[in-house]
Structure formats: C-alpha cells, structure tokens
C-alpha cells in the first residue's frame, strides 16, 4: 500500500517541532499515533516522545520496550476516542544538516514498512540559518522507502505532508509536551550512571561528574 498523503494535526506538529528544538547536538526521535483511511491517507493525531537509548549527532536508537509501550498508548487512545488508533509512523530531527533522509534513515524506514506498509517517516531539519536573511529555519519532509529498480538498495519517495490547523492544544498533545523535560532529565541521569559505572575514572573526575547530578 503506497501512502497517498499524510495529514498531521497542528498541535501534534507543534510537539514534534518543540522536541526537535530541545537539543542542538544530537538527534531526537518519537512515534506518531493515528489512523489510515480508505483513501490511503495517514492521519496523525498525536505523538509520543521517546527516551533515547543511544545519543549521537547523526543517529538515534530506541529500545524495543519503548516501542511496545507506544503500542499500548495507541490502544489506550483508541479506547478513549473510539477510533482505530495505532502507531502509524516515526519522526526524528536533523540538527544542522539537510532535511533529506540518510541511507540509514531509508533502511530504517524500509524495516518499519516490513511490519506495516502504511508506516511513514517524518524528518525535521532544525538549527538551519538562511544565508541571505541570517534567520533560523525549520524544514520538514515526509517519506517512505521503496526498492530501487536496478539495485538491492532502497530509495526514498516523498509523501505529501499537510498540517491541519488547530485552535487549541488537545489534552493528549499537551501531555506529550509536558513529558519532554522529564524525559530529557532521565536521559542525562542515564548518561551519568553509564559514565559513573566505568571503573577507570579517577576520583577528581567522579566528583566533577557527580556535582551535576
């Protein structure tokens, strides 16, 4: 099933942008909750901000446990709304680099589509400066992966993305936004524990690292 278009609610889009701007040095990632209609249009109603198990400037990884938790959250929203909600996509940021997906992004997207052919990927390119106006820009795109005709590799196909205006922030999106500071704090605590567990650190380094916990 080739997705024809993606419609994302304005408040869900706001959460994605806020999350993307939360860190300039590494990529961030989350999952999109919504439904797919009979016209093969994906409707994104909310997003889930995920805690990163590995923080890098050019990639991000999420634990299987969090993917399972996202499915549980989608089931909860389905009961509340009475609509067939499920995890319909993922999003991640590209700080200081192009909005176009890397070969790793394209392969990751292809892997997700093996589980759900209607799965989509969103990328938010942030901390980009317009050379003419010297103002910051945020670029975004939506894509899927397809098998290249003359290669075993995958290539991206762009999916039209439409932001549906919303006058207010719904409770489900507000809850996601409120979770962001807590998740960022947890990530820093996890990083501290990993460094603190290294046996070769000297006492001065341990005291310095511990002062910021």
Language-model regions, residue ranges each:
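MPN/JAMM (Mov34/JAB) isopeptidase/deubiquitinase module and associated MPN-bearing subunits/adaptors
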Residues: 1-89, 93-213
């Amino acid at each position: 099933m080739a997705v024809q278009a993606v419609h994302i609610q304005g408040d869900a889009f706001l959460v994605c942008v806020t999350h993307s701007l939360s860190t300039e040095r590494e990529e961030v990632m989350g999952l999109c909750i919504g439904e797919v209609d009979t016209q093969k249009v994906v409707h994104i109603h909310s997003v889930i901000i995920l805690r990163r198990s590995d923080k890098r400037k050019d990639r991000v990884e999420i634990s299987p446990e969090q993917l399972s938790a996202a499915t549980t959250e989608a089931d909860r929203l389905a009961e509340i709304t009475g609509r067939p909600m499920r995890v319909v996509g993922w999003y991640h940021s590209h700080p200081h680099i192009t909005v176009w997906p890397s070969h790793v992004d394209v392969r990751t997207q292809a892997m997700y589509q093996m589980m759900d052919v209607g799965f989509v990927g969103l990328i938010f390119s942030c901390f980009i400066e317009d050379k003419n106006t010297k103002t910051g820009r945020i670029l975004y795109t939506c894509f899927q992966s397809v098998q290249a005709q003359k290669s075993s590799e995958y290539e991206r196909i762009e999916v039209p993305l439409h932001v549906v205006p919303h006058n207010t922030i719904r409770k489900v999106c507000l809850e996601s936004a409120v979770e962001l500071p807590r998740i960022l704090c947890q990530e820093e605590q996890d990083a501290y524990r990993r460094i603190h567990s290294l046996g070769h650190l000297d006492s001065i380094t341990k005291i310095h690292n511990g002062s910021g916990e």
